[in-house]
Amino acid sequence: MGLYQAKNDEGSDPKSSSKIDDLIENEAEIIRLIKEDGKLLIDNGDGRDIHNIIQEDKLLSVEFNEVLKRFHGEEKSDIPRKEFDEDEDDGYDSNEHHQKTIEVMNTLNHVINKEVIPPENFSHVVGEIYRSSFPRQENFSFLHERLKLKSILVLIPEEYPQENLNFLKLTGIKLYQVGMSGNKEPFVNIPSHLLTKALEIVLNPANQPILIHCNRGKHRTGCLIGCIRKLQNWSLTMIFDEYRRFAFPKARALDQQFIEMYDDDEIKRIASKNNWLPLQW
C-alpha cells in the first residue's frame, strides 16, 4: 500500500488545520493510516509527519482525536504497534498443536470413528483439491482413509512436525512446502512467485487429491484459494465472500487486495501448456 501525501500550497502554514480538516472529512483510509502507522507525510521539506504536527498543536490534537472516535469508535492509542510481529493465526505453535490433540483425544466419544474427524476449517475446494487448518493426529485417518490424499501442500515456513512427517511416511503421502509469510502491514506481503509456485503444485492432477493448509487455514490458504477462484472466472464479490467466511473474524484487506492484484498470466500459461484448465468440479 502506497503512502498518502498531502502537499501544502506554496507559502501556507504547515500547522494549518484546514488541510487536515479536508483529509479528515474526505479520506477514511488516510485517517486509518494516520492512526495505525503515522505515515501521512507532509511534503514541505522538513521531513515531519502529521503525527508531529498534531502533537505540537494541542487544540488540533483534541479535534483530531474526536474525529478518530467518529471513524473508529475509540480514542487514538499512543501505544506503538509492533509492525512485524506474527499474527497468532500465522505462527505455528507446536505446543498448542500437541495440546489440542490431547484435548480432542480425551473428549472423543469412543463410538465415533476417527475417519470422520476432519481438520478445523476443512472444506472441499474443487475437484480433488481440499483446504483446512493444520492437521493434527486425530485427523490422520480422515485424510488417509476418506480423502485418500496423494499430497499435502503446507504454506508455513516452520519445520513440519515429526508426528505429521511420520504419518506421511507411513501412508506414502507426499509433502510440498512453499513457506510464505502472511499479508500484514506495513510491508510484509506474500511474494507473487511463491503463490504461482504453489498453484503449479495444486493444479497438477498428478498431485491430487491434495490438501492445502497453513496454520489456521485462513489467510495464506485463503489467498491461494482466491487465486484458484480467479482461474475459475469467479467474480471478485464471490471470491471475497468466500475468503471472509473462512478468515472470520480476522479478514485482512491486504489479502483481498493481493487476490485482486495477483497477475495470473504465468500460471495460466503453465496450466494451458499442461491442459490443467478448466478445473473440473
Swiss-Prot record:
Record function comment: Selectively cleaves the beta-phosphate at the 5-position of soluble inositol pyrophosphates. Converts 5-diphosphoinositol tetrakisphosphate (5-PP-InsP(4)) into inositol pentakisphosphate (InsP(5)), 5-diphosphoinositol pentakisphosphate (5-PP-IP(5) or 5-InsP(7)) into inositol hexakisphosphate (IP(6) or InsP(6)), and 1,5-bisdiphosphoinositol tetrakisphosphate (1,5-PP-IP(5) or InsP(8)) into 1-diphosphoinositol pentakisphosphate (1-PP-IP(5) or 1-InsP(7)). Also has activity on 1,5-bis-diphosphoinositol 2,3,4,6-tetrakisphosphate (1,5-InsP(8)) and 3,5-InsP(8).
Biological processes annotated in GO: actin filament organization; diphosphoinositol polyphosphate metabolic process
KW Hydrolase (keyword) present: yes
Alphabetized UniProt keyword annotations: Cytoplasm, Hydrolase, Phosphoprotein
Site (Transition state stabilizer): R220
pH profile: Optimum pH is 6.
Gene from which this protein is expressed: SIW14
Name listed for the protein in its UniProt record: Inositol diphosphatase SIW14
One cellular-component annotation, GO: cytosol
Positions of region (Disordered): 1-20
Enzyme class: hydrolase
Family under the similarity heading: Belongs to the protein-tyrosine phosphatase family. Atypical dual-specificity phosphatase Siw14-like subfamily.
Binding site for 1D-myo-inositol hexakisphosphate: N189, I190, H193
Phosphoserine PTM positions: S94
Phenotype of the disrupted gene, per the record: Sensitive to wortmannin; simultaneous knockout of KCS1 suppresses the effect.
Keyword Hydrolase on entry: yes
PROSITE patterns, sorted: TYR_PHOSPHATASE_1, TYR_PHOSPHATASE_DUAL
Effect noted on mutating C214S: Abolishes catalytic activity. Sensitive to wortmannin
Gene3D superfamilies from the UniProt entry: Protein tyrosine phosphatase superfamily (3.90.190.10)
